[in-house]
Swiss-Prot record:
Catalysis: reaction(s): glycerol + ATP = sn-glycerol 3-phosphate + ADP + H(+)
Gene Ontology terms, MF aspect: ATP binding; glycerol kinase activity
Residues binding sn-glycerol 3-phosphate, per UniProt: T12, R82, E83, Y134, D246
Annotated organism of origin: Renibacterium salmoninarum (strain ATCC 33209 / DSM 20767 / JCM 11484 / NBRC 15589 / NCIMB 2235)
EC number: 2.7.1.30
Pathway(s) the chain acts in: Polyol metabolism; glycerol degradation via glycerol kinase pathway; sn-glycerol 3-phosphate from glycerol: step 1/1
Pfam families linked: FGGY_C, FGGY_N
Positions annotated to bind ADP: T12, R16, T268, G312, G413, N417
Record-level GO cellular component terms: cytosol
Family: Belongs to the FGGY kinase family.
Protein name as catalogued: Glycerol kinase
Gene Ontology biological process: glycerol catabolic process; glycerol metabolic process; glycerol-3-phosphate metabolic process
Length: 504
């Protein structure tokens, strides 16, 4: 009997393959980073072919490290950076343009055009999302409008669209030789095109965007057998049986299956998801309404989400662009060497402000600078920015739900940073809890795939795998917490109203 499940985690900065055992423990991993392409200010792209090649390679790495073969693997699960759009030729398998990444802001003029007459909430009742550069829909329209011949080829039925889950699945299951063109409900809910109530593509919205329905993948549940692997000999005939967008996957991996449970993932961006059960809840406080998960024919679970565009990528910017640090862990050392931020606040609105503001006219700002400030203060302010943004999202969740969260489960790469987690607890005023397995995104995809093939029997079995690793209790006085929040909110206002006709 196969004793393991493999998860493919196609993320913003890298592609990984992680093998899990029945207890949810990591057996082995493979990881490769891909190039971040910045052709112009506000533009962010990935090479989709590089992503697929890396995916094949990391599968081999993970299997060889554990000395396993395809016969040991019960199923493949896939999780992915959501909203990142790939358009490719179904006959050649070649992308017609680079993947346009979720952080990319080039489509603001398309957003403005579509908002005429109905505002940015024109489609929100159906899809749960405001018009924004963040989601896939405007990216597809941009490719059709700007790549020579793309619109004509799409109209002829020659082009396919997918977020990177669809791109990886299509290639994994055969590509041009019968690859399965599908997506799951969680990824579909991030396109601007799926009706949350019917879980189907909305033709009226597609017509408004000018996107042919023939390009779109078939919408499936998050946990069912979609097909089997054909293009990788290493996993040949292994069922591909689970797909979840990365933030929904992390929620699933945290075993937040029930109404009122939540998690916050600290990665390139920061994403808090609050499970609303089988009810579609429309936020009045700047949150997104999205699909949480759907297991086979079981009822759909929905969620509220607070999306923060920049978290770990702010640390990358300090390292790779400014050269202020040599490695990400160095930030914790620098931040710990000073008692406070020296009066400095960094608002990392590189792609505008996401939740709860949704201000596309905002841009990054560093405020409160004096000659006293050194790079240690900057490092501390960079970490604190993530915690402050999370506090604002949590306030919105509490306002929408009417039941304040009493603790916050966390995961993602940044949760290894003890200083950040302590400050997060301090600024939230509630305990912050890290699980033993922090690779919850990949684990969630593995769980979805394993459930579909009977590797795990039910959600109760998955819940028993979850275990607490560390807990941070708030230690900040309430008066100081309130003062810090007032200063943060003041700093946020300084980032707004920047983009106008003079800014290119």
């Amino acid at each position: 009997m196969s004793q393991y499940v493999i998860a493919i985690d196609q993320g913003t900065t890298s592609s990984r393959a992680i093998i899990f055992d029945h207890d949810g423990n990591i057996v082995s991993t493979g990881q490769l980073e891909h190039e971040q392409i910045f052709p112009k200010a506000g533009w962010v792209e990935h090479n989709a072919t590089e992503i697929w090649n890396n995916t094949r390679e990391v599968i081999g790495t993970a299997l060889s490290k554990a000395n396993l073969t395809r016969h040991d693997i019960a199923a493949v699960g896939i999780t992915n950076q959501r909203e990142t759009a790939v358009v490719w030729d179904k006959t050649t398998g070649e992308p017609v343009y680079n993947a346009i990444v979720w952080q990319d802001t080039r489509t603001q003029s398309i957003v403005d055009e579509l908002a005429v007459g109905g505002g940015v909430e024109r489609f929100k009742d159906k899809v749960g999302l405001p018009l924004a550069t963040y989601f896939s829909g405007t990216k597809i329209k941009w490719i059709l409008d700007n790549v020579d011949g793309a619109r004509e080829r799409a109209a002829a039925g020659d082009l396919l669209f997918g977020n990177t889950d669809s791109w990886v699945t299509w290639n994994l299951t055969g590509g041009v030789d019968g690859g399965v063109h599908i997506t799951d409900v969680t990824n579909a809910s991030r396109t601007m095109f799926m009706d949350l109530a019917t879980l189907s593509w909305d033709q009226e919205i597609l017509d408004a965007f000018g996107v042919p329905a023939s390009m779109l993948p078939t919408i499936k549940s998050s946990s069912e057998v979609y097909g089997t692997v054909h293009t990788s000999q290493l996993l040949r005939e292994v069922p591909v049986a689970g797909i979840l967008g990365d933030q929904q996957a992390a929620t699933f991996g945290q075993a937040a299956f029930n109404t009122g449970e939540a998690k916050n993932t600290y990665g390139t961006g920061c994403f808090l998801i609050f499970n609303t059960g089988e009810e579609i809840v429309h936020s009045k406080n700047g949150l997104l309404t999205t699909v949480g998960y759907k297991l086979g024919d079981a009822p759909t679970h929905y969620a509220l989400e607070g999306s923060i565009a920049v978290a770990g990528s702010l640390i990358q910017w300090l390292r790779d662009t400014l050269g202020m640090i040599s490695s990400a862990p160095e930030v914790e050392e620098l931040a710990a060497s000073v008692e406070d931020n020296g009066g400095v606040y960094i608002v990392p609105a590189f792609s505008g402000l996401f939740a709860p503001y949704w201000r596309s006219d905002a841009r990054g700002a560093i405020v409160g600078m004096t000659r006293y400030v050194n790079r240690n203060h900057i490092a501390r302010a960079a970490l604190e920015a993530t915690a402050f943004q999370t506090r604002e999202v949590l306030d919105a969740v509490n306002a929408d739900s009417g039941v304040p969260l009493t603790e916050l489960k966390v995961d993602g790469g940044m949760v290894a940073n003890d200083a950040l987690m302590q400050f997060q607890a301090d600024i939230l005023g509630v305990p912050v809890i890290r699980p033993k397995v922090t690779e919850t995104t990949a684990l969630g995809a593995a769980y979805a795939a394993g459930l579909a093939v009977g590797f795990w029997n039910d959600l109760g079995e998955l819940s028993s795998n979850w275990a607490e690793d560390k807990r941070w209790e708030p230690a900040m006085e309430e008066d100081e917490r309130a003062r810090q929040l007032r200063l943060w909110k003041k700093a946020v206002t300084k980032s707004m109203d920047w983009v106008d006709e003079d800014v290119r």
